[in-house]
Swiss-Prot record:
The lineage of its organism: Bacteria, Pseudomonadati, Dictyoglomota, Dictyoglomia, Dictyoglomales. This is Large ribosomal subunit protein uL1. HAMAP family: Ribosomal_uL1_B (MF_01318_B). GO terms for biological process: regulation of translation; translation. It comes from Dictyoglomus thermophilum (strain ATCC 35947 / DSM 3960 / H-6-12). The gene is rplA. Gene3D superfamilies: 3.30.190.20, 3.40.50.790. Signal peptide: none annotated. InterPro entries: Ribosom_uL1_bac-type, Ribosomal_uL1, Ribosomal_uL1-like, Ribosomal_uL1/biogenesis, Ribosomal_uL1_3-a/b-sand. Binds directly to 23S rRNA. The L1 stalk is quite mobile in the ribosome, and is involved in E site tRNA release.
Length: 242
């Protein structure tokens, strides 16, 4: 493994070896670790006690971060007629049908989220025509993540406001951006606890033993801060009841 630079080593020294931090302590510390010359993204990585090789243990969903991600998302909508108008009024960046499919087939991918109405998925044969292009990039509209829907306006507004998708990778880890280093501690904390609360609600019935195996937050260019998982479920419930 390549040796980390001096700056990284200095930041690493701020993390107490062997300590597991409370969520609020971790948020406070991670802001101090974000010393790059740009507004670093704060990333959350949660290793869950699931076996993603089994379909009934995969964790996938979306969450609307109360303080957003700090990044404006470009939203594309496959829709026609009244639904297309709803999408435009809700703030979608690109709205269309066959024209957009052809653009994507020719290599254009200047968007972050693709949403579609259920009927247009079939009439334009989107899964068969665009599956190999959008699928590997995580851009394929999907009913499970709310991106195949008749409530186009709601979906567009939520993604513009800070809705993010997540799913377990093959190691059972979920990666979610929870904001920028410039966010207040309160904003990062609320975003963090919102994601953890969503993950807890999505716990598969087949998952056995400890659910939250490990939780880390880190800036784009800095080391990870470990969060104590011991009483995290109780803390999530306290936050939601507050």
């Amino acid at each position: 493994m390549a040796k980390r630079g001096k700056r990284y080593q200095q930041l690493l020294s701020l993390i107490e070896k062997g300590k597991l931090y409370s969520p609020k302590e971790a948020v406070s510390l991670v802001k101090k670790l974000a010393t790059a010359k740009f507004d670093e993204t704060i990333n959350l990585a949660v290793r869950l006690g699931v076996d993603p090789r089994h379909a009934d243990q995969q964790v996938r969903g979306t969450v609307v971060l109360p303080y957003g991600t700090g990044k404006e998302k470009k939203v594309l909508v496959f829709a026609e007629g009244e639904k297309a108008q709803e999408a435009r009024e809700a703030g979608a960046d690109y709205v269309g049908g066959e024209d957009l499919v052809k653009q994507i087939e020719s290599g254009w991918l200047d968007f972050d989220v693709a949403i579609a109405t259920p009927d247009i998925m079939g009439t334009l044969k989107i899964p068969s025509r665009l599956g190999k292009i959008l699928g590997p990039r995580g851009l394929m509209p999907n009913p499970k993540t709310g991106t195949v829907t008749n409530d186009i306006a709601k979906a567009v507004k939520e993604y513009k406001a800070g809705r993010v998708e997540f799913r377990t990778d093959r190691y059972g880890i979920v990666h979610v951006p929870i904001g920028k280093a410039s966010f207040s501690e309160e904003a990062l904390y609320k975003n963090l606890m919102t994601v953890l609360g969503t993950l807890l609600r999505l716990k598969p019935a087949a998952a056995k033993g400890q659910y939250f195996k490990s939780i880390y937050i880190s800036p784009s260019m800095g080391p990870s801060v470990p969060i104590d998982t011991k009483n995290i479920a109780d803390l999530i419930k306290q936050e939601e009841a507050a």
